[in-house]
């Protein structure tokens, strides 16, 4: 992350977006989702992001292994029962996912290896990876980038603290697939430098371009495929719009949300919906910017922005530390996964449900310890949530889970 040096486990808070082990079913605060609608399945030592394939009628889940990397895999689940139908071995850890369903390809960010993994969803085989970047000597890279003075001293102290000399200068967290061009778009979180956007040509199987100019900690990304726009948010209150065809930055807007971690685009209303995470990262951000950043939001909120201008159309509180969000276009429901704490011993995370048009909160569902990412099966009208361990669950070696929620017709 930009201006931040940390251990791989600490960086996972951004890479997984970047995600239960407690017995029992989730409880709903009001009518809507009830205990009878919820099924939970413990699966692996770690689960991160998911993609539902209508073609395969399967749910694909990234399952990295922190203790033994070669045990990392993609799980293929039955979307009705959550039974594991196939395990697809990976050589390295995979995190964020993007699906090319027509081409039977699943792409995974391999954030600690500088690559994008490729999986054949029809045959359940890994097809290798696409290289994005090499390791560099970070001190040399900082000096070559013109970093000096207090900012350089701060970064070098962080390198010394964590005993880092060589590393990847950018971390890859999220990934989006453009079906019109076959391109992948991947924000690269700058490791002490401004972030970039990686563009991969999947038809050629190679990196096409690296685009600079994405500021401190570029994290959120979504596409307007019909309008040919890519939207990227960062952790300094900016929304950057890229032309999806020319790959030129069309606009950079200052917005009234400091940490838009994840975004979705609503084509029906030309709005961007995003979660403002609310985690304290003032020190790192101020060092990176060389000034005191003035906060614009209380955090822990859901925002609706005009996609053309970045103007706030609506904003409502959600629960603490929102991570993933998903828009059900048919029902106009917005689902938000809230961690309710970072690195806590006992997690009490929730799923909040909003009316997507007004952002009125409709329901809160307990999904402890830490709900993370979301996927939707529109055919079966089912919502899926990955739920990650808290401190106690990790120490006990409990597996992380996927939850299936049967949604009701609106």
Language-model regions, residue ranges each:
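Bacterial N-terminal signal peptides
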Residues: 13-23
